[in-house]
Amino acid sequence: MTAQHNIVVIGGGGAGLRAAIAIAETNPHLDVAIVSKVYPMRSHTVSAEGGAAAVTGDDDSLDEHAHDTVSGGDWLCDQDAVEAFVAEAPKELVQLEHWGCPWSRKPDGRVAVRPFGGMKKLRTWFAADKTGFHLLHTLFQRLLTYSDVMRYDEWFATTLLVDDGRVCGLVAIELATGRIETILADAVILCTGGCGRVFPFTTNANIKTGDGMALAFRAGAPLKDMEFVQYHPTGLPFTGILITEAARAEGGWLLNKDGYRYLQDYDLGKPTPEPRLRSMELGPRDRLSQAFVHEHNKGRTVDTPYGPVVYLDLRHLGADLIDAKLPFVRELCRDYQHIDPVVELVPVRPVVHYMMGGVHTDINGATTLPGLYAAGETACVSINGANRLGSNSLPELLVFGARAGRAAADYAARHQKSDRGPSSAVRAQARTEALRLERELSRHGQGGERIADIRADMQATLESAAGIYRDGPTLTKAVEEIRVLQERFATAGIDDHSRTFNTELTALLELSGMLDVALAIVESGLRREESRGAHQRTDFPNRDDEHFLAHTLVHRESDGTLRVGYLPVTITRWPPGERVYGR
């Protein structure tokens, strides 16, 4: 079957909903659809806890927010994109206020702000510690006012259709029925989130399998800066559930097994009773996660069945503050760790959290393929560089989701197709994909290979090779191992051949793309022979601006081989310098 829309947004999280709203606002005459693997309110945006950064205080400035972001990203951020981001973030948060987002308030009724890691001013808006949930709920309620926006909930996009170099639609499968549909579009926007599930221990929801990255990669768009994987310093052991940075912003301390605030040993300042901006627990995430590794190597972490941990101490904050500003943290600790942070230490360890890399786009979300756009964690614009600052991701998906929506609306209005229907080339692509999906559904496999085993081996390879610290030999081995996993995947089978909610088929389709994304991560890491931000090479321990002040671009050739190149970083105002914290 075939459907047709002017614009299709793939992904129903924060970036996808904001893009769809922007399209409806820009040109109400355009036919818009959202294709989402889950119901929108189950998207991973709901898991963002801490807040959203934007300059609104008289003592703050756009330049300071931009400089914090650029230095936090170890000077790999494109500064034109950063300047656009910080300029537009305030109006996006105010717009959410007008749409009903329940931001936390000061006693005088003004919006409250909290400190966040790497920021020199208090500029992070928050809704207790459920900011992402309230943000997404507000966007979803706003979207529902545009009744003409069609939703394909619980549909999985499997390939993009390309006609004469232009993206003109996609093929998707309905999870509830197994129905395969060709969906034609004048423009497509990818908003499918990150790819944290290529790792075994992550804060990411099960749906974050790099689908949009793989779709773009296979269609011919390059991935950018994929070696930069953010490890958040405070995840609950075993589950990987995030303990928000807001816990440290409100005054939480990180302690080693001796009860010592160990961050003072890693050039992050000296301990103070109250949180100090850009110091100690409010340093950037890459530095805090690296400090954990050093503590472990010194034998100062605590061994548990789920790996080494340190402790997050919130006891001195008291029950009233925790219940007012960190209620979800207390709930998570009780439900998943069986402890009460009001009276007990919280065990934490670094956990894969966010991809700084993604589909290469310009500041309007346009990829190198005409008709294809991307926003949110799927994209790399790049405002995050080598390390994202906490509370920048939510305003990023708002700013660039809106930009991508407006740009796609303009493009679609100028490139609306006639009623002739798809070209013969597009029809052939769609038929080929439908036949492939039918074959995947009937896979019986050879040699007993299982999808779950291949996925587990991929995750183990990524954890070993693309961790907080990396080295050349391990990355080289990882490239070879993932190539072998791709060969094993080709012979794997599935047991469930039904069409109704076939989760085994979904896992197979996800893993196919995950292997491509995983290969891009380790290949990019191998080629970058320096240490910068979240990419730390023990065999190249220094930052090398002469050779690597550039974005890594990875292209996938038609035979599956990768071609790696570099794109200079855009510097407008702030030349590279030392990252200074705690002073």
Curated annotation (Swiss-Prot):
Known catalytic reactions: a quinone + succinate = fumarate + a quinol; a menaquinone + succinate = a menaquinol + fumarate
SUPFAM superfamilies reported in the protein's UniProt record: FAD/NAD(P)-binding domain, Succinate dehydrogenase/fumarate reductase flavoprotein C-terminal domain, Succinate dehydrogenase/fumarate reductase flavoprotein, catalytic domain
Protein name: Fumarate reductase flavoprotein subunit
Family as reported in the entry's similarity comment: Belongs to the FAD-dependent oxidoreductase 2 family. FRD/SDH subfamily.
Disulfide bridges in this chain: none
UniProt modified residues of type Tele-8alpha-FAD histidine: 44
EC class name: oxidoreductase
Superkingdom field: Bacteria
Cofactor note: Binds 1 FAD covalently per subunit.
Localization terms from the record: Cell membrane
Oxidoreductase among keywords: yes
UniProt xrefs under Gene3D superfamilies: FAD/NAD(P)-binding domain (3.50.50.60), Fumarate reductase/succinate dehydrogenase flavoprotein-like, C-terminal domain (1.20.58.100), succinate dehydrogenase protein domain (4.10.80.40), Succinate dehydrogenase/fumarate reductase flavoprotein, catalytic domain (3.90.700.10)
Any one GO MF annotation of this record: steroid dehydrogenase activity, acting on the CH-CH group of donors
Cofactor: FAD
Residues at the active site: 232, 248
Record InterPro entries: FAD-dep_OxRdtase_2_FAD-bd (IPR003953), FAD/NAD-bd_sf (IPR036188), FRD_SDH_FAD_BS (IPR003952), Fum_R/Succ_DH_flav-like_C_sf (IPR037099), Fum_Rdtase/Succ_DH_flav-like_C (IPR015939), Fum_red_fp (IPR005884), SdhA/FrdA/AprA (IPR030664), Succ_DH/fumarate_Rdtase_cat_sf (IPR027477)
Binding-site residues, FAD: 11-15, 35-37, 43-51, 155-157, 211, 353-354, 377, 388-394
Topological relation to the membrane, as annotated: Peripheral membrane protein
Subunit structure comment from the entry: Part of an enzyme complex containing four subunits: a flavoprotein (FrdA), an iron-sulfur protein (FrdB), and two hydrophobic anchor proteins (FrdC and FrdD).
A GO-annotated cellular component: plasma membrane
Species this protein is from: Mycobacterium tuberculosis (strain ATCC 25618 / H37Rv)
